[in-house]
Regions:
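S-adenosylmethionine
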Residues: 1-227
């Protein structure tokens, strides 16, 4: 009712219909664990070679390499703005995939992978990045891949329960260039001008969950957003 009243019957109905469609599934490969994936600094502009070795049937040289990740046997095209991003035709049971638990890839919406393209123009490799609202860690792991071994990502999450999930995902990703903190943002103000980049994916209205979770729609209200 709120959507229809705010957008009108035509646009409102179109939005409601879109929210009822199955969201596309996409994953992002881990360059540190998939041989031939994009090098640090190439992920954000789509110039990295097609992932090979552990990640695809052919290496960047075109020679035969070990079998691809099983999850990519279900690939349904590349994510245009992320060299390591792939759409999947159907959603597999990720919890049963050892590659998922080993951090060989991260399940992440293609729209979230676009942040790498936004940051890419600044030259991310070797930079110090503060991810201020980091849990559960999807963007943190992307920043870690972009920064490379000479960079540093400080992933901050004030909610300690969510910070544990963040730490688990960072550990699986395995790049070794991420520090997880649970500071109040004002505490990090003491590091003025120390970071090269600050990323803030702030808590918001939650509308991005509407397509994934019917309960999120049922619980949404202007009052909850203001909270």
């Amino acid at each position: 009712e709120t959507v229809l009243s705010e957008l009108g019957p035509e646009e409102g109905a179109a939005l409601c219909a879109a929210l009822d469609t199955e969201p596309p599934v996409s994953v992002r490969l881990n360059p540190a664990k998939c041989a031939g994936a994009a090098e640090p600094g190439a992920v954000q502009d789509g110039t990295g070679a097609a992932p090979g070795g552990y990640g695809s049937p052919q290496g960047s040289s075109g020679t035969d390499v070990p079998a691809p990740l099983p999850v990519l046997q279900n690939a349904d095209g590349r994510v245009p703005w992320c060299a390591d991003g792939y759409y999947l035709a159907v959603r597999p049971q990720f919890t049963f995939d050892s590659d998922f638990h080993a951090g060989a890839y991260y399940v992440q919406e293609a729209s979230s992978q676009f942040v790498g393209r936004l940051m890419g123009g600044e030259g991310v490799a070797g930079k110090r990045i503060l991810d201020l609202c980091a849990a559960p860690g999807g963007k943190t792991t992307l920043y870690a891949s972009l920064a490379g071994p000479d960079g540093l990502v400080v992933a901050n999450e004030i909610d300690r329960r969510r910070a544990q999930v963040l730490a688990d995902n960072v550990r699986k990703w395995g790049t070794g260039n991420v520090a997880v903190t649970t500071c109040e943002p004002r505490q990090l103000g003491d590091f003025e001008a120390w970071f090269d980049m600050v990323a803030v994916d702030a808590p918001c209205s939650g509308e991005g969950m509407f397509r994934k979770d019917a309960q999120a729609r049922a619980e949404w209200s202007e009052g909850n957003v203001k909270l």
